[in-house]
A protein has these predicted regions:
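Catalytic domains of cell-wall/extracellular-matrix polysaccharide-remodeling enzymes
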Residues: 16-67, 188-216
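N-terminal start-of-chain detector that recognizes signal peptides
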Residues: 2, 54-58, 160-163
Length: 245
């Protein structure tokens, strides 16, 4: 891996963030959670205080992290904090088999009237050259591989609310269990690509809206927090050398 290439990419990312948000970023979600030992030096040079990586990047670190991925660790030599992605909450959302987006109530991404309807009917709405394209209008929900049932937005919205409650309940129980033996406030790091919400998972923004409201109004066990806020409240953390991720 060319360090200068990595340094240039990080520099561009920091510069772009500052141009958009008007301030320098405090941390970074490394592309595809990729980390190579020594990259934390480059991040520190860029003024970044923390980064997110996959669970094994923390779990396979040396020495082994006392709290697993449920507390950040500091990189030896630089002091840059490393947050490992939580496996359980990631699976609940990202898994193509067990994840929420695959529920039969949700809109089917791969069926679009640009390909489903008769060519003469759809011709005015597709590519000027006559090539069929996705129009964004989708009539079906995720049911079977061939015969699909019609999409019902009200049913999908109810399911999004239900699954937001399920996600919150699981995090509550997860936090209660972890705090019981950690005796330190654990953190559940749950990062998701923005393209999931509204693109692959059409109801994703609704689910996220329900989840945030439920966490704020419906319980008192967990709360939303950023990595920066967690580090300010919990500055004492283990020092390790993260593994390749």
């Amino acid at each position: 891996i060319c360090r200068e290439s990595v340094r240039a990419q990080v520099k561009v990312a920091v510069s772009h963030y500052e141009a958009v948000f008007g301030r320098k970023p405090r941390g970074i979600w490394l592309p595809e959670c990729g980390y190579h030992p020594g990259h934390d030096e480059i991040l520190k040079e860029a003024g970044l205080r923390y980064f997110l990586t996959d669970a094994h990047g923390v779990l396979h670190g040396a020495p082994r992290p006392k709290y697993g991925c449920f507390a950040p660790v500091y990189c030896r030599g630089t002091g840059v904090a490393c947050f490992g992605r939580d496996l359980d909450s990631s699976k609940q959302v990202w898994s193509s088999i067990d994840g929420y987006p695959g529920d039969y109530s949700y809109r089917e991404f791969y069926r679009d009237i640009g390909f489903d309807l008769d060519y003469d009917y759809i011709r005015p709405y597709i590519h000027p050259d006559g090539v069929r394209i996705n129009t964004g209008i989708k009539y079906y929900r995720i049911t079977g591989s061939d015969n699909k049932e019609s999409y019902n937005p009200h049913l999908a919205r109810e399911k999004a609310a239900q699954q937001a409650g399920n996600f919150m309940f699981n995090r509550e129980k997860q936090i209660e269990y972890l705090y019981g033996f950690m005796q330190k406030k654990p953190i559940i790091v749950s990062p998701y690509d923005a393209e999931l919400f509204g693109h692959w998972w059409y109801e994703g923004p609704q689910w996220l809206d329900f989840l945030i409201r439920k966490i704020i109004f419906d319980q008192k066990t967990i709360r939303l927090i950023t990595p920066t806020e967690y580090l300010l409240e919990n500055p004492r953390n283990q020092v390790i050398t993260p593994s390749l991720s």
